[in-house]
UniProtKB/Swiss-Prot annotation:
Cited PROSITE patterns: CYTOCHROME_P450 (PS00086)
Entry-listed glycosylation sites: N90, N96, N167
Organism expressing this protein natively: Nepeta racemosa (Catmint)
Transmembrane segments: 1-15, 61-77
Compartment(s) of residence: Membrane
Membrane topology: Single-pass membrane protein
Protein name, as recorded: Cytochrome P450 71A6
Lineage: Eukaryota, Viridiplantae, Streptophyta, Embryophyta, Tracheophyta
């Protein structure tokens, strides 16, 4: 029997190779996998880094298995272009992920909704009504006011304790939350408000943080279905229910407040919608289309607002935090930027958004920071809707797709000195991060690209320019800039592992 078995094994091996050759299929290169786990054991704490390492061995297009789920990983501009441009329609679907589905009202949002008529209608509403260039510009005053408030907070802290460290990460979080609350909800839910408003403050900040953490969880039972029984013990379901319930109650009250106000003021806006917040606009669209097949019900409004919180706050804070950290760690670049910003500002006390177009180095700094520190390094997963080929390799329908934009941004075959912070590389090139240049895609591209890139850039550029205009920065406790800890945290968005603590000194011309 043993002799027969030994003779059979080579036969089975060659039979498998013959069948693959005969079928004409050319699967992408794939690292060896384990039974049941597939390649899950190779992901580690930082999947974007682990996948970059694997791609250096197996190529820019490779296939892994997360448990029973086939996953295509793209790690080059050419592969990203093929998926997000040449075959955008074939890869426009989203996988049905359990945690986003439950957090976002059964995927009634824009980011995670499956491709189809509902998604097309909702995305169109977001692009045309909420995130158009005209709409972004209409909120310019809000961004400028809240940025000035942040500066005043830093000034007060510095006057009280001139040598004390300031948690810049916290201040940037407050800035983006306050800007977004005013733009989306019509007012801030922060500050010294008392009573019911204070409940909203604590609840909003706490639950937003938990919301972002939960989105970054990939439970093992999602890839290995027979382990689903373990979800009874991991506590994730309870956390999801708590966050979902709190947000549902909060957003329900916000919507009701808008309805009561509109009824009291008999608000019927025709044509001019300047000054309306996102909830106003969505409710107006709901009223105007109540007799049609419009998908905008209250549930959709809540899901879209949560989507906007994710895109408008967490990723924006992440981008600012990394940009400032890189500037502090690279004093030469900081001095160049401060010279540019202060030169444009001249004797003016405040930076205005109209000044930003005169600051090419500022824009280069943001591009370079996003190249090195994409807020969502693997982008939001896609899913193939049909059998197809990617760069000569066969990809089956239903394959999950990850685009490692973090690895693309650090690809030494694309970027000279790819690990070095050099904003100058963008001064003589038209490369941008809006989705047309696939070597720099922190916001994705194509149908499923982030529609809020312009919104995020407006906050990032104004806040960064204002901070370097108003202050000089050093690290607390005598820490040298070259020793600034640039470790990454983990999660859906990749923050610094530790908050950015600085000692700010008001610049002589602005103090």
């Amino acid at each position: 029997i043993l002799i027969a078995l030994l003779c059979t094994l080579p036969f089975l091996f060659f039979l498998k190779k013959w069948r693959r050759s005969y079928s004409g299929k050319t699967p992408p290169p794939s690292p060896p996998k384990l039974p049941v786990l597939g390649n899950l054991h190779q992901l580690g704490t930082f999947p974007h880094r682990s996948l970059q390492s694997l791609s250096r061995r197996y190529g820019p297009v490779m296939q892994l298995h997360f448990g029973s789920v086939p996953v295509l990983v793209a790690s080059s501009p050419e592969a990203a272009r093929e998926i997000m441009k040449n075959q955008d329609l074939n890869f426009s679907n989203r996988p049905n992920l359990s945690i986003p589905r439950r957090l976002l009202y059964d995927n009634h949002d824009v980011a995670f909704a499956p491709y189809g008529e509902y998604w097309r209608q909702i995305r169109s509403i977001c692009v045309l009504q909420l995130l158009s260039n005209k709409r972004v510009q209409s909120f310019r005053r809000v961004r400028e006011e809240e940025t000035s408030i942040m500066v005043e907070k830093i000034m007060q802290l510095q006057k009280t304790t001139p040598t004390a460290a300031v948690n810049l990460t916290d201040l940037l979080t407050c800035l983006t939350n306050d800007v977004f609350c005013r733009i989306a909800l019509g007012k801030k839910y922060g500050g010294t408000t008392t009573g019911d408003g204070e409940y909203h403050v604590r609840s909003l900040k706490k639950n937003l943080a938990e919301f972002y953490v939960l989105l970054g969880i990939s439970p093992l039972w999602e890839y290995i279905p027979w382990l689903e029984w373990t979800r009874r013990f991991d506590g994730v379901d309870r956390r999801i229910e708590e966050v979902s319930r709190t947000f549902d109650e909060f957003l329900g009250k916000v919507i009701q407040e808008h309805r009561v106000r509109d009824k009291r003021e008999d608000t019927t806006v025709v044509g001019d919608t300047v000054g309306l917040d996102f909830v106003d606009l969505l409710l107006q669209f709901q009223r105007e289309n109540e007799r049609s097949s419009s998908p905008v019900d209250d549930l959709t409004i809540k899901a879209v607002i949560l989507d906007m919180f994710l895109a408008g706050t967490d990723t924006t804070v992440t981008a600012l935090e990394w940009a400032l950290s890189e500037l502090i760690k690279n004093p030469r670049a900081m001095k160049i930027l401060q010279k540019e910003v202060r030169g444009v500002a001249g004797s003016k006390g405040e930076i205005e958004e109209s000044d930003l177009e005169k600051m090419p180095y500022l824009k280069a700094v943001m591009k370079e920071s996003l190249r090195l520190h994409a807020p969502v390094p693997l982008l939001v997963p896609r899913e193939s809707t049909r059998d197809t080929k990617v760069l000569g390799y066969d990809v089956a329908s239903g394959t999950r797709v990850l685009i490692n934009c973090w690895a693309i941004g650090r690809d030494s075959s694309v970027w000279e000195e790819s690990e070095t912070f050099l904003p100058e590389r963008f001064l003589e090139t038209s490369i941008d991060y809006r989705g047309m240049h696939f070597e720099l895609i922190p916001f994705g591209s194509g149908r499923r690209g982030c529609p809020g890139a312009t919104f995020a850039a407006a906050i990032d550029e104004l806040a960064l320019a204002t901070l370097v205009h108003k202050f000089d920065f050093k690290l607390p406790n005598g820490v040298r800039v070259e020793d600034l800890d640039m470790s990454e945290g983990s999660g859906f968005t990749i923050h610094k592992k530790f908050p950015l603590l600085v000692v700010p000194t008001p610049h002589a011309c602005t103090s």
